Amino acid sequence: MGQQHGTRNGLTHRELPRGVGLLLAMALMNVALYLCLDQLFISPGRSTADSRRCPPGYFRMGRMRNCSRWLSCEELRTEVRQLKRVGEGAVKRVFLSEWKEHKVALSRLTRLEMKEDFLHGLQMLKSLQSEHVVTLVGYCEEDGTILTEYHPLGSLSNLEETLNLSKYQDVNTWQHRLQLAMEYVSIINYLHHSPLGTRVMCDSNDLPKTLSQYLLTSNFSIVANDLDALPLVDHDSGVLIKCGHRELHGDFVAPEQLWPYGEDTPFQDDLMPSYNEKVDIWKIPDVSSFLLGHVEGSDMVRFHLFDIHKACKSQIPAERPTAQNVLDAYQRVFHSLRDTVMSQTKEML
């Protein structure tokens, strides 16, 4: 009897920790899953980037701890090693280059008749340095060169090709894609309220051209890169803009950017009415639709964005929302869907 009593107590002593251990393991798994969910649905923001901003005239990139002064003409000529050409546009040719073991993008003016556009883009880069714009490393007006941080993932045009790679499958979700759309709208909002006044992204007459103006960073953020065509709208003085001097076609551009006098009247630039920053708002739904792609859940996001996108496509510019209005709507949808999915997931545990 004594032996049996001892055995019975021994079994109880061994079994109790097993049960407690199982409960503890399940609790830890739930905590880990909650943390993963919170990380997956992390709200978009660039506080880290903000804390790393340098004063005007200085830059920092990659693993640099301290800010350095923009490189001078002499430093660009002697310290930058040109590697290979990676792009070319109407104004400049771009080369992957190296500076002190940092990969950088060296832009060279290719046509002297485009120097005014080149210098305009440089002035915009210098004045609009922020988390929304590619980092300026140096420049030389005399040589027609601009040096910026290099982003190996390239322009937004490459987004689908990039996200289809197996190593990026974890970020190929509607959550991350919606965050990209929010960052795109944030850039438009920044340009419309920039330190240089209301600026319009004019190099955007079709979707491929628009996407080519932005770069995808290695941490899957978006920065504006090509600022050669950012005319100023001044509502107080009644100054409006026109994107170029040629007739525009298609439904990607806003209705007010189209020739209003019919096919029987030949296009004349001096007769073409001017317009304001609401042309950027018209294009947001098309760019966002591209960014959302066709992954699981992206159509659900489109459904929730239907009303704000419908407002963006108003034929009357004044009735379109502001970029801030659009951004607010995107954030509401993001948080609403995040809370819904997290709630459903936690209920399944």
Curated annotation (Swiss-Prot):
The keyword Cell inner membrane appears for this protein: no
Catalysis performed (reactions): 3-O-[beta-D-GalNAc-(1->3)-beta-D-GlcNAc-(1->4)-alpha-D-Man]-L-Thr-[protein] + ATP = 3-O-[beta-D-GalNAc-(1->3)-beta-D-GlcNAc-(1->4)-(O-6-P-alpha-D-Man)]-Thr-[protein] + ADP + H(+)
Topological domains, Cytoplasmic: 1-19
Membrane side Lumenal: residue ranges: 43-349
Residues passing through the membrane, by range: 20-42
Keywords: ATP-binding, Endoplasmic reticulum, Glycoprotein, Kinase, Membrane, Nucleotide-binding, Signal-anchor, Transferase, Transmembrane, Transmembrane helix
Coiled-coil stretches noted in the UniProt entry, renumbered to this chain: none
Cellular compartments annotated: Endoplasmic reticulum membrane
GO CC terms of this entry: endoplasmic reticulum membrane
Protein family membership: Belongs to the protein kinase superfamily. Ser/Thr protein kinase family. STKL subfamily.
PANTHER family: PROTEIN O-MANNOSE KINASE
Protein name as annotated: Protein O-mannose kinase
Protein species of origin: Mus musculus (Mouse)
